[in-house]
Swiss-Prot record:
L-aspartate binds at E182, R228, H456, R497. It is found in: Cytoplasm. It comes from Agathobacter rectalis (strain ATCC 33656 / DSM 3377 / JCM 17463 / KCTC 5835 / VPI 0990) (Eubacterium rectale). The keyword Secreted does not apply. Catalyzes the attachment of L-aspartate to tRNA(Asp) in a two-step reaction: L-aspartate is first activated by ATP to form Asp-AMP and then transferred to the acceptor end of tRNA(Asp). This is Aspartate--tRNA ligase.
Length: 598
């Protein structure tokens, strides 16, 4: 039977009790981690979010009733204990912060009993993730998850303090917004009052923070909840948190400078890591050419090498065919791996195909300087020597090549580079390599839409020196956009925004927007800008991803209290779920029957 805690007041969390309290009376409360009955004494490990404290029950101190009660305790019972702190008389437990003290109980109350949990509440649980997420309220009791969430709380606190000291105003923007279908898929919310009309949950506060700049709030900041109905992966959730900011009367360098200082301060305050600033900057084109990625992991080499010029006249049709079709031939040097088993090379080929390649060419440089290759018979010895020299190959190296359109070649070799870097132990997991990727293309061509699309969003300012190409070569126009990358992860990004009417109108025209469509989707923003808007720029980065890097986990679910699984469902609450037909009727919604798959 559960007891009341009336009249009791917790004096300390478990690990707040220390040698300084020896001889003092304390009141502690928490969960029973473990009970050991030694006959005349009962030992209980009491757990709260701070850690574990040993409680000792002896009949002479706690009384017959209290001792009997202690004997009934099981894992996860919630108890309150009054007692006196003393130095441990038995062996000290070096693994516990409180390992050299204990509390001699003088009274106990069982505040809540517990049934046997489906898994043991312990560090590094081997329980399947599905079971852990189904009973997330139990999983959240585990010390490692609690440390993760406490670190996350600290990250948010430090961010807020820093931004306030920098003169930013924390302003909340709406959650119920208008759908603007230029980005990822929206989560839609039907309106009960306006039948047939829908709100959208925000993918970001983009439009509202620009409106705040037009309204004179020259430094805005928000810890923003954002929603995207897109396929999930290890570092992506349908709802996520970003640190969002916008500044007026600034250019790229101003935004980059304040964010570098923020990240330096954050890593020092939260995990005591010194981050050097300024961060390196790399144009998008260079990142793609060197690393095959716009979010390169610069902790190791194995950079891509363009060998198109070397092989343009060779007899290997795969290479020359790719070049004739406007593509390129590039390679990576996997140093010291010439003796990689053929089965492993075949796996690399399959991985390359999974990334869009038709195949993968390879060349092994034997220790005697001879070559073993999938294409050597199509090239002369001089051509092979020139190719190896271009790749800085030496005896013992394995050279891998992809030939196709640039986009495919970058994707294939970039993915192989990351896979091999991890498998061969080339990545220093203790390094924090920050990088700004800049000068992104303003536009990218969509075969599906048969038009140019904004690589970021329609309000991104083009680089002034490229603007004269907007009609003749739109794909060559670079944007005043920048992404912040950490160890191969895009933490976030931003841009300088368009604040000039003529540039914005031209941007909409290039994107295929009529004036009517532009006004229908973004009229409130365009109207606001007609009343005077300052030059402005901003950035947002993912809080979840920063926490992942600080904790060295590649699973975003480990840093979110109540995450979704891969199909965007919540195993604990069973969301999404069906709703009462009356609710649907009020909203004017009829659910279409699913068609049977043939």
């Amino acid at each position: 039977m559960a007891e009341s805690m009336q009249g009791l007041h917790r004096s300390h969390r478990c690990t707040e009790v220390s040698n300084a309290n020896i001889g003092e009376k304390v009141t502690v409360m928490g969960w029973v981690q473990k009970r050991r009955n030694l006959g005349s004494l009962i030992f209980v490990d009491l757990r709260d979010r701070s850690g574990i404290l040993q409680i000792v029950f002896g009949e002479e101190n706690v009384g017959a009733e209290g001792f009997e009660k202690a004997g009934t305790l099981r894992s996860e019972f919630v108890i309150a204990v009054e007692g006196t702190v003393q130095k441990r008389t038995a062996a000290v437990n070096e693994s516990l912060k409180t390992g050299d003290i204990e509390v001699i109980a003088t009274s106990i109350r069982v505040l809540s009993e517990a049934q046997t949990p489906p898994f043991h509440i312990e560090e590094n649980s081997k329980t399947s993730e599905d079971i852990r997420l189904k009973y997330r309220y139990l999983d959240l009791r585990r010390p490692d998850i609690q440390r993760n969430l406490m670190l996350r709380s600290n990250v948010l606190r430090v961010m807020r303090d820093f931004m306030a000291n920098e003169g930013f105003l924390e302003i909340e923007t709406p959650i119920l917004c208008k759908s603007t279908p230029e980005g990822a898929r929206d989560y839609l919310v039907p309106s009960r009052i306006h039948h047939g009309h829908f709100y959208a949950l925000p993918q970001s506060p983009q439009l509202f923070k620009q409106l705040l700049m037009a309204s004179g709030y020259d430094r805005y900041f928000q810890i923003a909840r954002c929603f995207r109905d897109e396929d999930l992966r290890a570092d992506r959730q349908p709802e996520f948190t970003q640190a969002d900011m916008e500044l007026s009367f600034v250019d790229i360098d101003d935004v980059i400078e304040v964010n570098e200082r923020l990240l330096k301060h954050l890593f020092k305050e939260v995990i005591n890591v010194d981050v050097e600033i300024p961060f390196k900057r790399m144009p998008w084109q260079e990142a793609m050419d060197r690393f095959g990625s716009d979010k390169p992991d610069t902790r190791f080499g194995m950079e891509l090498c363009d060998v198109s010029e070397v092989v343009k006249d060779c007899g290997f049709g795969v290479f020359t065919g790719a070049l004739e079709n406007g593509g390129s031939v590039r390679g990576i040097n996997v140093e010291g791996q010439a003796k990689m088993p053929r089965k492993k090379i075949d796996k690399l080929v399959e991985h390359a195909k999974g990334c869009g390649a038709k195949g993968l060419a390879y060349l092994c440089i034997n220790e005697d300087g001879t070559y073993k290759s999938s294409f050597a018979k199509f090239m002369t010895e001089a051509e092979l020597d020139a190719l190896v020299a271009k790749m800085n190959g030496k005896p013992g190296d394995l050279l891998l090549f992809a030939a196709d359109k640039n986009k495919i070649v970058w994707n294939v070799l970039g993915a192989l580079r990351l896979m091999l870097g991890a498998e061969l132990g080339l990545i220093d997991e203790n390094k924090y390599n920050f990088l700004w990727v800049t000068e992104f293309p303003l536009l990218e061509w969509s075969d599906e839409e048969n038009r140019f699309m904004a690589m970021h969003h329609p309000f991104t300012m083009p680089m002034e020196e490229d603007w004269d190409k907007i009609d003749s070569d739109p794909g060559a126009v670079r944007a005043k956009a920048y992404d912040i990358v950490l160890n191969g992860t895009e933490l976030g990004g931003g841009s300088v925004r368009i604040h000039q009417d003529d540039i914005q109108e031209k941007m909409f025209e290039v994107l295929g927007f009529t004036k009517e469509r532009a006004h229908e989707q973004f009229g409130f923003l365009l109207d606001a800008f007609s009343y005077g808007v300052p030059p402005h720029a901003g950035l947002a980065f993912g809080v979840d991803r920063i926490c992942m890097h600080m904790l060295h986990t590649d699973n975003i679910k480990e840093v979110i209290a109540f995450p979704k699984v891969k199909d965007a469902s919540d195993l604990m609450s069973e969301a999404p779920g069906t709703v009462d037909p009356k609710q649907l009727e009020e909203l004017g919604i009829a659910v279409a029957a699913e068609e049977d798959e043939e």
